A protein has these predicted regions:
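Short inter-helical turns and helix N-cap capping residues of alpha-solenoid HEAT/ARM repeat scaffolds
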Residues: 124-125, 157-162, 192-193, 225-226, ...
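N-terminal signal-anchor transmembrane alpha helix of single-pass membrane proteins
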Residues: 1-41
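Membrane-proximal soluble helical/coiled-coil segments
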Residues: 77-177
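Long, contiguous interaction/recruitment modules in multidomain scaffold/adaptor proteins
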Residues: 154-166, 170-202, 206-213, 222-225
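Structural detector for internal amphipathic alpha-helices that build alpha-solenoid repeat scaffolds
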Residues: 98-108, 130-142, 166-175, 196-209, ...
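Amphipathic alpha-helical scaffolding segments comprising HEAT/armadillo-like alpha-solenoid repeats
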Residues: 72-78, 107-121, 144-155, 177-188, ...
Length: 381
């Protein structure tokens, strides 16, 4: 089994585990749904009644003591996952019915209670811990209690339970604190059960804070991480910032660097064309060494938006490769360069069967795509 296959299967396993979490969670919800829904509706009505009375007096903010009194009146203990779920649904119902102000008043009054609850849920069954991380992501608001909650989430993020880890990381991304996200990445990097890099990349992309600050801090700590974490970071940077060219160029041209990291850097320059990177990409794409086919394939794709001396020549050279992926990427990039059938006649009429067949394949593929688009347009009329 190749390394790429292992990565695909590992990523699939992580995705499957999260699907299983959602399925189990939904099954539990269905079993308790009638009772929970009825109770949530009752809590919502009680909240609305309080809000209406407060509106008459001009006071819509809930102090913590009032929140605690309300919870006691309604026999809700947020330390119990069933009651936490009921409360969550009740507040969500308010917001869904256009009563966001009423919901927000309660949520803000709840903030001082969250640190103690977060520590309490850490001691519970990890599925409950995982759910509380979701609760925090949804109901935490920026306050003086953030530092305590961030520390709790770091503890959640190092649990062996995968659901707990991923939910905790999602909450940390939602908090938008770059310092703590980097701390969480560092902890994931050191764990035996590593979080798949695609999951980590997608999480970083969802970060709600300043991406420039997060990227700066990740680059500063870059050499401290293992290769898999580095790869996740590079892919994140590729999607979020065009201001890291010098950093990426150094990785791309470092022959001692891990090849997967170099590939990531090459892809970066495919997304953000840079004149200084052009000659290196041309060199990679023109490399006829069979063992270097991956460099040639990635570089051929990256040259799609480059023009100037050497680019077309390198792509035509890549089109003669014995490797299908190199040929395909070269053909796509030649098309992107705007080369028509007539301009590619030297390739089509040449003696190299691989190159000729690939261009024929791409031209036929493009024709089929256009036909499908025309069919869709015809159906929509």
């Amino acid at each position: 089994m190749s390394g790429s296959e292992v990565l695909i299967y590992a990523y699939g396993a992580v995705c499957l585990s999260m699907i299983m979490f959602n399925m189990i969670y939904n099954i539990v919800l269905r079993k308790k749904e009638p009772e929970t829904t009825m109770k949530a509706q009752k809590i919502k009505e009680a909240l609305l009644k309080k809000y209406s009375a407060d509106s008459d007096t001009g006071t819509t903010e809930w102090e913590t003591v009032r929140v605690q009194a309300f919870l006691k009146e309604e026999d809700l203990e947020l330390g119990k996952s069933e009651d936490l779920l009921t409360f969550s649904e009740a507040v969500s119902l308010l917001a869904e019915e256009g009563l966001e102000e009423a919901a927000e008043g309660m949520i803000r009054g709840l903030q001082p209670l969250l640190p103690a609850l977060s520590e309490d849920y850490l001691k519970k069954d990890k599925m409950q811990t995982a759910y509380f991380a979701v609760f925090l992501e949804k109901f935490r608001r920026r306050s003086e209690y953030d530092s305590a909650l961030l520390e709790s989430l770091l503890k959640y993020a190092v649990q062996e339970n995968m659901y707990c880890r991923i939910n905790a990381l999602d909450a940390l991304y939602a908090f938008g604190n770059a310092e703590y996200v980097v701390k969480a990445v560092e902890k994931q990097d050191k764990m035996d059960a590593f979080l798949h890099e695609k999951v980590l990349t997608e999480g970083l992309l969802s970060f709600s804070g300043d991406h420039r600050e997060l990227i700066k801090e990740l680059i500063r700590r870059f050499e401290e991480f293992k290769v898999k974490t580095k790869l996740a970071i590079l892919n994140y940077i590729r999607f979020k910032s065009e201001d890291c060219k010098e950093f990426m160029y150094k990785i791309m041209t470092d022959e001692e660097e891990d090849r997967e990291l170099r590939f990531a850097a090459v892809r970066y320059f495919g997304r953000y064309p840079w004149e200084q990177a052009r000659s290196v990409l041309i060199e990679f794409a023109s490399d006829k060494e069979v063992l270097h086919w991956e460099y040639a394939a990635v570089a051929a794709a990256a040259l799609k938006d480059y023009r100037g001396d050497g680019v077309l020549s390198a792509l035509k050279t890549a089109l003669y490769s014995s490797n299908w992926y190199v040929r395909y990427n070269a053909a796509v990039s030649l098309e992107a360069a705007g080369m028509s059938y007539n301009r590619l006649i030297d390739v089509m009429a040449g003696n190299d069967r691989y190159a000729r067949e690939m261009m024929e394949y791409r031209l036929e593929e493009r024709k089929l795509v256009k036909e499908r688009e025309l069919q869709k347009e015809g159906k929509s009329e």
